Amino acid sequence: MKPTQDSQEKVSIEQQLAVESIRKFLNSKTSYDVLPVSYRLIVLDTSLLVKKSLNVLLQNSIVSAPLWDSKTSRFAGLLTTTDFINVIQYYFSNPDKFELVDKLQLDGLKDIERALGVDQLDTASIHPSRPLFEACLKMLESRSGRIPLIDQDEETHREIVVSVLTQYRILKFVALNCRETHFLKIPIGDLNIITQDNMKSCQMTTPVIDVIQMLTQGRVSSVPIIDENGYLINVYEAYDVLGLIKGGIYNDLSLSVGEALMRRSDDFEGVYTCTKNDKLSTIMDNIRKARVHRFFVVDDVGRLVGVLTLSDILKYILLGSN
C-alpha cells in the first residue's frame, strides 16, 4: 500500500525533528564523552623508520597513528594508510630510488608527498573538551575519517596526544545514545546522500597499481569489486595495501586484485550492503551492532549502484541533504 501524502509529511517532519535533536546532542557532548573508560593509544616518533611503523600498525590492527616530533615536543600529524600508499606510488614511479625505502623515516614522508604533488600529512586536530559537533565539522572539512584530540599540560604547556576520534565511533555513540535515530524513516535514496556519479570500481583481474591510483585520485578508502555484469562481489580497501607492503611487494604491483586478496588477513570485517529503500534508522542500527565503515548500495538483484559512506551520513546529520 502506497503511503499517503499525510503519512509522508509526518515521516518528513519526524525526521527533521530527529536530526535537529541529534545536532543538539552533538553540541551538548565533548570528545571526552565518546572515549571509553580505558583504551590504548599508540603514538609514533617521527624519527621511526617507515617500515617499522608499518609493522606497528599491522601488529595492532590499526589504520592510523598520531605522530610526535620529539625535537619540538609537538604533535606532528596523523599517519594513515594514505601515506603508505603514497610511498608505494613514489617508488613505483622512481624505481631507481627503491634501495632507499628501507632507510626512509616518517619525517621524510613530506618530501615524498611533495614530490608526488599530493596532500601532506594531515595535521588537523581539536581539543577534546570542544563540542563533539565541532569535531565532526573539522573532520568533514579535512575530508578525513578521524581527528586527533590534542590537549595541553597546564603547567608545562606542552601538547598531549589524548586519542584519535573516528567517524565510526561518533556515529556508534549517536546510535547508542539517541533514540531519535528510530525516527529517521525516509529512504536514503530520497535524501540525496548516496555517491553514485563517477564512482570507481574494479574487477578481480584489475592490476593492484590501478586500484591504488583509484584510491588516491578519488581520495577514497576502498574500491568496490564487481563482476562483468556489474554485480558486487567484494571490496579492495586501503588497509589491504599495507599487507602487500609487509610482504615486500613495493615494485611488483602488476599482480591482480584477486591475487592480492589471497593475502588478506582473516580479520576482514566483510562487505556491508543496503538498497536505496533502506532507511537511516536501519543504517544506524547496523552501525550500533557492527564495525561498519561504508555501505555499498545495490539494486534488487545485487548490482552495484552507489556507496554510502560514514562521512555522507555525518554530513547529512550536521548539514542536511546535499
Curated annotation (Swiss-Prot):
Residues that hold ADP 2 according to the record: T195, S221, S222, T309, L310, S311, D312
Gene name of this polypeptide: SNF4
Effect of N251I: Leads to resistance to 2-deoxyglucose
One function term, GO molecular function aspect: protein serine/threonine kinase activator activity
InterPro entries listed in its UniProt record: AMPK_gamma/SDS23_families, CBS_dom, CBS_dom_sf
Name by which UniProt lists this protein: 5'-AMP-activated protein kinase subunit gamma
Binding partners and assembly: AMPK is a heterotrimer of an alpha catalytic subunit (SNF1), a beta (SIP1, SIP2 or GAL83) and a gamma non-catalytic subunits (SNF4). Note=Interaction between SNF1 and SNF4 is inhibited by high levels of glucose.
UniProt similarity note: Belongs to the 5'-AMP-activated protein kinase gamma subunit family.
GO BP, sorted A to Z: autophagy; cellular response to glucose starvation; filamentous growth; peroxisome organization; positive regulation of gluconeogenesis; regulation of carbon utilization; regulation of cellular response to glucose starvation; regulation of glycolytic process
Entry domain remark: The 4 CBS domains mediate binding to nucleotides. Of the 4 potential nucleotide-binding sites, 2 are occupied, designated as sites 2 and 3 based on the CBS modules that provide the acidic residue for coordination with the 2'- and 3'-hydroxyl groups of the ribose of AMP. Site 3 can bind either AMP, ADP or ATP (AMP, ADP or ATP 2). Site 2 binds specifically ADP (ADP 1) and is likely to be responsible for protection of a conserved threonine in the activation loop of the alpha catalytic subunit through conformational changes induced by binding of ADP.
Consequence the record notes for mutating C136Y: Reduces glucose inhibition of SNF1 and leads to resistance to 2-deoxyglucose
Source organism of the structure: Saccharomyces cerevisiae (strain ATCC 204508 / S288c) (Baker's yeast)
Sites where the protein binds ADP 1: I42, R146, T166, Q167, Y168, R169, R291, V292, H293
Broad class of where this protein is predominantly found: nucleus
Binding site for ATP: T195, K200, S221, S222, T309, L310, S311, D312
Note from the entry: Present with 11700 molecules/cell in log phase SD medium.
Protein role: Adenine nucleotides-binding subunit gamma of AMP-activated protein kinase (AMPK), an energy sensor protein kinase that plays a key role in regulating cellular energy metabolism. In response to reduction of intracellular ATP levels, AMPK activates energy-producing pathways and inhibits energy-consuming processes: inhibits protein, carbohydrate and lipid biosynthesis, as well as cell growth and proliferation. AMPK acts via direct phosphorylation of metabolic enzymes, and by longer-term effects via phosphorylation of transcription regulators.
Outcome (variant: H293A): Reduces glucose inhibition of SNF1 and leads to resistance to 2-deoxyglucose
Localization per Swiss-Prot or TrEMBL: Nucleus; Cytoplasm
